[in-house]
């Protein structure tokens, strides 16, 4: 513990004892989802918000019962906006887009938001704002204001904030602010950036990677072992993003090896952690259909740059980089139909609380049973509503403090 009684910030693995985690309790942003916009906002359906909140509360309570400090993004954002004028300016600047609103309305809206109390501003930055909710009168000189319908968004909501894994991740003692690939999510990183830059809890936290234009999302990044990072490249993270991340962590001496893992560019496998997560220091649970075909390019830090080898079988390359004889794969033993169903329902997306202890959705009965048969303790949570955005326990959590391995 540090002087404040909090666990030291940082993580060097996926499975070290989890001490503190960043979550986002679903809020009014989910109530903005409609049949007209849910695809654009990356949700497969319209979640029952009250039930989603109940499920998320149970998830957070489970973590607390295991000694994990739960930090809620909305609370941190409200505290930050209330304490820092610079944070307010940064948040408003990211949310008010003159290219969309025009100069007149953008100026009027920004001026209004500068006087909004921190709790209300926090809600607007996460849940968005419609033209009906504008304080600016319809007879303004803004053509945009006159021509838009009342329910259209002036500031888009951020329903995918639920998945805190993607907009930042910790590697060693540093935090990486990512670059999200799709328009519906781009502004999320402005909020995590505000919190890490201005909240007292993170004072002095150094950055590992930030502000690159090439997309890198946290769901594609696995800390396989101290000094060894796997980065999925597929629907979200690009090869250029993976290369930029590798060079950044090498320059900061946060890793000696980066494995770049091509994955299918499909909704079902949008991130590496939708098909593979670590459940012990030498074990993964993996979508069985890809087990024999997943490959990796190995990037090593060298004295005068980097070297790239491969592609080689992922399991072989990972074990070699980790310095172990073999990476154990939990044999889910599922037929193709059941495997596909449970992968779609985030059966492979587990959150490790410690070596051999994971949180998983209860609905993936077969995968959970096989994990337990292999000696893994599975802590089950409900996710019938949380899963409608295609994310499981790992997606919904950003570890900010783990014990080192």
Curated annotation (Swiss-Prot):
GO terms for cellular component: cytoplasm. Its EC number is 3.5.3.6. GO terms for molecular function: arginine deiminase activity. Pfam families: ADI. Pathway: Amino-acid degradation; L-arginine degradation via ADI pathway; carbamoyl phosphate from L-arginine: step 1/2. GO terms for biological process: arginine catabolic process to ornithine; arginine deiminase pathway. InterPro entries: Arg_deiminase (IPR003876). It catalyses: L-arginine + H2O = L-citrulline + NH4(+). SUPFAM superfamilies: Pentein. Gene3D superfamilies: Arginine deiminase (1.10.3930.10), L-arginine/glycine Amidinotransferase, Chain A (3.75.10.10). Keywords: Arginine metabolism, Cytoplasm, Hydrolase. The active site is at 395 (amidino-cysteine intermediate). It is found in: Cytoplasm. Belongs to the arginine deiminase family. This is Arginine deiminase. It comes from Rhodococcus jostii (strain RHA1). The gene is arcA.
């Amino acid at each position: 513990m540090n002087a404040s009684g909090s666990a030291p910030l940082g993580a060097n693995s996926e499975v070290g004892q989890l001490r503190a985690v960043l979550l986002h309790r679903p809020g009014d942003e989910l109530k903005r989802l409609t049949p007209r916009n849910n695809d654009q906002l990356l949700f497969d359906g319209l979640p029952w918000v009250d039930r989603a909140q109940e499920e998320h509360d149970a998830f957070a309570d489970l973590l607390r019962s295991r000694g994990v400090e739960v930090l809620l993004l909305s609370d941190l954002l409200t505290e930050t906006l209330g304490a820092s004028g610079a944070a307010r300016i940064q948040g408003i600047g990211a949310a008010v887009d003159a290219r969309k609103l025009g100069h007149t309305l953008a100026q009027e809206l920004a001026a209004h938001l500068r006087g909004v109390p921190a709790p209300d501003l926090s809600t607007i930055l996460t849940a968005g704002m419609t033209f009906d909710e504008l304080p600016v009168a319809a007879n303004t000189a803004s053509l945009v204001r006159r021509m838009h319908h009342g329910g259209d968004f002036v500031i888009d909501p951020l329903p995918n904030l639920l998945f805190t894994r993607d907009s930042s991740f910790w590697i060693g003692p540093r935090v990486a602010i990512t670059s999200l690939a799709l328009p519906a999510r781009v502004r999320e990183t402005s909020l995590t950036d505000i919190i890490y830059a201005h909240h007292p809890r993170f004072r002095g936290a150094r950055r590992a990677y930030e502000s690159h234009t090439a997309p890198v999302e946290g769901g594609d990044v696995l800390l396989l072992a101290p000094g060894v990072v796997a980065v999925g490249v597929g629907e979200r993270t690009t090869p250029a993003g993976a290369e930029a991340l590798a060079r950044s962590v090498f320059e900061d001496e946060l890793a000696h090896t980066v494995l770049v893992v091509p994955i299918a560019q499909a909704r079902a496998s949008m991130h590496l952690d939708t098909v593979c997560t670590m459940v012990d220091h030498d074990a993964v649970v993996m979508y069985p259909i890809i087990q024999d075909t997943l490959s990796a390019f190995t990037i090593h830090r060298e004295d005068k740059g980097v070297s790239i080898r491969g592609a080689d079988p992922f399991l072989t390359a990972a074990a070699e980089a980790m310095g172990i004889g073999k990476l154990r794969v939990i044999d889910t033993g599922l037929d193709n139909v059941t495997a596909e169903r449970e992968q779609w329902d985030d059966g492979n997306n587990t959150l490790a609380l410690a070596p051999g202890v994971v949180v998983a959705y209860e609905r993936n009965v077969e995968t959970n049973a096989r994990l337990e048969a292999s000696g893994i303790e599975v802590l089950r949570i409900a996710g019938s509503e949380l899963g409608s955005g295609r994310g499981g326990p790992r997606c919904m959590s950003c570890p900010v403090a783990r014990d080192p391995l």
